[in-house]
């Protein structure tokens, strides 16, 4: 061996171990027993001579620290560049940690071998550990080429488990969020059970905010499931924070911990402005936190930090609460509360949060607390029945059979002003911003402009039963006793569309929210005979009434007339509207074409009350029943009974609806319980 020429370092690392093993085998067969110790010592020295340069070349920091300080940058780059992401020293993902139990067993088996075999195996491991990716591949190819079938079978069984990687731990948080946002609710909950790291990512606000946006107040196009409305203010304020976290603003990274506190903290490592957070939903929770904060020591910064962090609800909790409410709607699980106090039929109502206002034929307006059921105040002033009302944070406006309109400060009970402009009873009113529209039996709709103190009248052929203003598009919807609903342009004071298909008086007309999506569900709907023509879309308008043809816009760009084209900033009217009438039907219309897209059948008598949001339609009528509809499925409906007389009015929110009837009662169906 001494006379053998000295090979290069690379050749030594690849050839000499096999030569050493071969020499060792030959020595066991040919050398005398007395020379065994000398031969073993010679092989060990030769192995050290061959392995040392290899280790010094590819692991300079450990085996050649002085050389590593003066090594060329290109060589250092070549050494590190070949590693995969698991073994890249500069990567945030460290080497895959060996299983402690497996290593213990491996070490025990190694200790059973002779000392020379242990050293040889250790040299092989050291060579492979120090080798770059290319050399490792060559080593593995050589090992596989010399392995028999039992050994290959063992390798196959072992590799099957080893190649399973935690890809979410390997990826940056923003990419992990991108992947998780494609999962459904059930899959996200299962992902949170994989590991603490997965739980921190799967429970993060970035993921669940997307889930809330996709399902709350709308039907998901993928799963067909929709959840009740979330508070708009909280949704808007949190959006900026979620966008920052989704793009890894501030290099946030979820922390992995064993406790729940660590998980919550990992979701709040980025601290945007306070406006981007979600406040507590009740004053009781805030009071409880205030007591806990006051009771704690002011010297402890941890208590202060915990105090502020617990004020924000994770989006997963918001989704969970909305999901519970949605399931209650689906299975008709609700609590019922009855408000008694009126001495005549309840004709109108409105509620916001815990405030409910009702108007009755007993000429009073009552204000209720829906949480306690307590009657807070009774407003008196009208000399005949109150037929319509609407309120906001500061004022209440009522219309009465005494032909007057009154404006109240409902917090104090004071009547601020009174308007007399109709010749007969005021049946409906609606205000939006600075405009008020009132409808009357005198066949007119009067528009009151509080800003410039002006008024004008929209004439109708018969009495008007309902009116709705859309200030964004500057249009008005009206329902008339002549069996038609109309869309008016407030700028030109003209009727731009007539919806004429009811048999009998139209009692209600409302616009569906602009964000509602019905295109996919209406693609195969069967339209009424007035809606479409068998000859195609060009003949749609030919089947409508002469009044519609006379008032339909001729401008080629906008279906609503030239006034919309002249003002580029003007938004078109809502795309869909609903009407109900004494013919027991509810009809869905497309405003741009005047088509009746769908008819809802189910009531046995005339429909007096109608309300809707993006998820459902609520209606009540002379048959004493309340029906809840899905605007996408005309045949599906839930029926609620409880009134002993006709249902005159209804109010709908994300988690409850309230009705008033001729039995003098107001009934609240609450799905939050």
Swiss-Prot record:
Biochemical pathway: Protein modification; protein ubiquitination
CDD domains cross-referenced by the UniProt entry: F-box_SpPof1-like, WD40
Keywords, comma-separated and alphabetical: Repeat, Transcription, Transcription regulation, Ubl conjugation pathway, WD repeat
Residue span(s) of domain F-box: 165-211
Source taxon at top rank: Eukaryota
WD repeat boundaries on the chain: 341-378, 381-420, 422-458, 460-500, 554-599, 602-639, 642-673
PROSITE patterns, alphabetized: FBOX, WD_REPEATS_1, WD_REPEATS_2, WD_REPEATS_REGION
SUPFAM superfamilies: F-box domain, WD40 repeat-like
Disordered, as annotated region: 1-39
GO biological process: protein ubiquitination
Role of this protein: Component of the SCF(sconB) E3 ubiquitin ligase complex involved in the regulation of sulfur metabolite repression, probably by mediating the inactivation or degradation of the metR transcription factor.
Complex and partners: Component of the SCF(sconB) E3 ubiquitin ligase complex.
Similarity-based family: Belongs to the WD repeat MET30/SCONB/SCON-2 family.
Official protein name in the record: Probable E3 ubiquitin ligase complex SCF subunit sconB
Gene: sconB
């Amino acid at each position: 061996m001494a006379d053998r020429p000295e090979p290069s370092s690379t050749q030594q690392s690849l050839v000499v171990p096999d030569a050493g093993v071969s020499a060792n085998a030959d020595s066991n067969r040919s050398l005398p027993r007395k020379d065994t110790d000398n031969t073993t010592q010679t092989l060990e020295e030769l192995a050290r001579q061959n392995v040392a340069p290899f280790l010094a070349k590819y692991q300079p920091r450990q085996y050649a620290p002085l050389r590593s300080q003066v090594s060329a940058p290109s060589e250092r780059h070549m050494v590190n560049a070949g590693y995969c992401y698991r073994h890249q020293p500069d990567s945030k993902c460290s080497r895959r940690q060996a299983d402690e139990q497996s290593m213990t067993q491996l070490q025990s088996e190694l200790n059973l071998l002779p000392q020379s075999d242990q050293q040889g195996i250790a040299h092989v491991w050291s060579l492979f550990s120090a080798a770059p990716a290319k050399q490792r591949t060559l080593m593995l190819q050589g090992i596989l080429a010399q392995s028999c079938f039992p050994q290959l079978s063992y390798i196959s069984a072992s590799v099957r488990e080893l190649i399973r990687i935690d890809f979410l731990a390997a990826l940056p948080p923003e990419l992990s969020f991108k992947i998780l946002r494609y999962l459904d609710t059930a899959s996200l909950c299962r992902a949170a059970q994989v590991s603490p790291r997965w739980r921190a990512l799967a429970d993060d606000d970035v993921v669940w905010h997307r889930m809330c946006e996709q399902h709350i107040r709308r039907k998901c196009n993928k799963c067909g499931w929709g959840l009740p409305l979330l508070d708009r203010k909280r949704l808007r304020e949190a959006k900026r924070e979620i966008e920052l976290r989704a793009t890894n603003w501030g290099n946030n990274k979820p922390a992995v911990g064993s406790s729940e506190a660590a998980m919550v903290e990992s979701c709040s490592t980025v601290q945007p402005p306070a406006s981007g957070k979600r406040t507590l939903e009740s004053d009781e929770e805030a009071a409880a936190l205030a007591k806990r904060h006051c009771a704690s020591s002011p010297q402890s910064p941890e208590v202060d930090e915990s105090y502020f962090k617990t004020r924000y609800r994770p989006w997963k909790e918001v989704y969970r609460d909305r999901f519970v409410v949605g399931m209650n709607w689906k299975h008709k699980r609700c609590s019922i509360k009855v408000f008694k106090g009126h001495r005549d039929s309840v004709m109108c109502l409105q509620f916001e949060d815990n405030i409910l206002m009702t108007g009755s034929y007993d000429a009073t307006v009552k204000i209720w607390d829906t949480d306690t059921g307590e009657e807070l105040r009774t407003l008196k002033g009208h000399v005949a029945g109150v037929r319509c009302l609407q309120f906001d944070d500061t004022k209440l406006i009522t219309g009465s059979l005494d032909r007057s309109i009154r404006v109240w400060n409902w917090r104090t009970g004071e009547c601020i002003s009174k308007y007399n402009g109709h010749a007969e009873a005021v049946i409906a009113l609606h205000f939006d911003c600075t405009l008020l529209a009132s409808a009357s039996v005198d066949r007119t709709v009067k528009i009151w402009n509080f800003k410039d103190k002006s008024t004008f009248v929209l004439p109708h052929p018969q009495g008007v039963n309902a009116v709705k203003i859309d200030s964004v598009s500057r249009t008005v919807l009206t329902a008339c006793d002549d069996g038609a609903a109309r869309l008016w342009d407030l700028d030109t004071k003209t009727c731009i569309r007539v919806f004429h298909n009811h048999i009998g008086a139209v009692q209600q007309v409302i616009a569906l929210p602009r964000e509602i999506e019905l295109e996919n569900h209406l693609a195969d709907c069967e339209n009424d005979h007035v809606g479409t023509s068998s000859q195609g879309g060009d003949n749609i308008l030919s089947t409508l009434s002469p009044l519609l043809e006379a008032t339909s816009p001729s401008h080629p760009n906008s279906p609503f007339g030239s006034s919309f084209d002249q003002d580029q900033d003007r938004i078109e009217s809502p795309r869909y509207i609903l009407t109900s009438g004494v013919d027991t039907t509810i009809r869905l219309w497309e405003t741009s074409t005047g088509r009746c897209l769908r008819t809802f059948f189910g009531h046995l008598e005339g429909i007096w009350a109608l309300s809707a949001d993006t998820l459902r339609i609520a209606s009540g009528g002379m048959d004493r029943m309340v029906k809840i509809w899905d605007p996408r499925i005309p045949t599906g409906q839930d029926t609620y009974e409880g009134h002993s007389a006709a249902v005159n009015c209804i109010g709908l929110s994300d988690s409850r609806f309230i009705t008033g009837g001729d039995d003098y009662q107001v009934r609240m169906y609450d799905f939050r319980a």
